[in-house]
Amino acid sequence: MDTNTLPPKPSISPSIASSFPTVKPFSSQNSTTSNPELSHIEKESNASSIIISQQPLSPSNISSAAPLDETHIATKASASLRNNNVSPHIPSPSSFSSSSSSDLDKSMLDEKHPDSEDITAVSLSTPPFPESIDVARFSSEEKKILSRIRRKLDLRIITCLWITYFLSRSVTYSISLSLTMNKHQGHSLLQTVSGLNYHTLSVGTGLSYVSLIIFDLPSNLLMTRADPRLWLSRIQVTTGIIGACHAVLGTKGSSASGFIALRFFNGLAIAGMWPGFAFYTSRFYRDQHLGKRIGWYYTAAQISSVATSLLSAAFQKMDGLHGLYGYQWMFLIWGVVAFTQGLFLPRWLPCIKHNQHNEKWISWIRIPKFLGFLKASENTGLTPEEEEVHAIYMAEMQVGKSWTLTDLADAFLDVRLWPPIFMFFGVVGISNGLVNYSSLIISEINENFSSVTVSLLVAPIWVFDAIAILTVLPLHDRFHKKMLFFVGSCLFVLAGLLITTFVSNVWGRYVGLLILGFGLGPTVPIIMTWVSSAMGPSHGDVGVAAGLAIVSGLGNLGSVVATSALYSGWKADTTFRRSNETMCGMVGIAIVASIVMHMVQKFNIRRFPFKRIYACLSERRKKELSVT
């Protein structure tokens, strides 16, 4: 158990400090009857009251405190702040659960009240009371306000992210479709680019995921230092530019090396988008409301796959128009639309409000007056009352908390970060393998299918994927059984792979692909929600940003395996049977990792047995605290 993980204690103004109640530490002789002030507090059990237990403070009873949710949310510090119209930032009980009792006592008793040596003045960054804390409940009116807040945020955030992800995935998914477009006319991507074959295709696709893995973490960490809206806008704009540049493929000077370079830069441009979406969303929604919202905008990937599959049939009709192949028109149109939409992201998305003094490196970009309509919005769209309630609702997530390299290292060494990597490895490898090679897999099922038929048969796979997201994730948020829902989804994936691999009937194998798509749908949103809820209360912004980026980045090694070593990258596997069998093994890895994650959280395991490393981190943290 780490004994040096307390956050630094900032200075606090007298006006705010006076809003905190002062409480004498309990002794063994104290009782409710001998303490009139405590008796009075315990009698106030309405919606905004708080009960202070007489149980002595210890790390065990702090860590066992129930997690804050909509019905258990505000500590006495938050209630006091609310009464004084101050936006609170309340530390999570879990944020100091790994500290020793002596360290907690020292940190909470180092400021003395002028009238008594036994009374503490509570800091905003330390636990408000030297006793175990029970929490108040939101009133029915506040619950209505929270529902209204979520509806307002959904309209701006989820709508914007859905469209952004839809266009981004359309740009990416167009590569897969271009492999078979106008094949019978000899105008597919494979037939018109000199030197491009299945091997170079696998190399290019694999390199796109390599660049994604390398740049996911720095891209997501920048979101804690820059305005996330500006960074997401940069990602979408560059994705559109690189997507449109794919139209040069098929011209006289194009080659396989040009395709490989474009795929690498596409991965570089898009790096940080998916974990960035999850990070941004987690700054507005708590765990019990986050999963289905990630699922909502994740359906954009599935709908995009359907839309691009259907629209590719129309693009094939444009083949030869103005001297361009059908796939060149597809790259150009999707790229330009994505670029244009990316310019409006800062204006569309609400800003993240917090009361931390965490200055952003980039919070605005100077633009000409005639482009003033693109300027980033400076409000959340909420009323002051709604912002106050939302601040209490999000208090445990430590939104806007500043961080150092020591905090980043501490997040990396959190045990809860690593099982989701293997979960992501398994399911995303399969998902991206299906995205990139679905048209080839269907063509292998029946070689007599035309290119248009193949494009149309791809679409229902992603319809089933979207249906699963919309039906499973609301149940996941309601019952909070992450492992159960994840393992159940993985079993659907496994069943789909086995049917597609071993059934001889053509349409039976296609049904296996539909089952596979249904199982894949809920897996990624569950993983991202799991990581955010585990890392946010303990590590703040840096924990969520780094955790999501590491899981997404290293987990995409599964995509490298699926796109480079399997399917078209496995020359001897002409029927894709061995590739599907390998995918079954990857599903097994994901299932085992989810069980490990469940056990790690059940037994509250957060640290590896690396005593020397944690000792070094503790010393470094002490030096940082002494400087501040």
From Swiss-Prot:
The lineage of its organism: Eukaryota, Fungi, Dikarya, Ascomycota, Taphrinomycotina. Its main location: membrane. It comes from Schizosaccharomyces pombe (strain 972 / ATCC 24843). It is found in: Membrane. Residues 12-21, 48-64, 87-102 have a biased composition (Low complexity). Belongs to the major facilitator superfamily. Allantoate permease family. One of its GO terms (molecular function) is solute:proton symporter activity. This is Uncharacterized transporter C1B3.15C. The keyword Transmembrane helix applies.
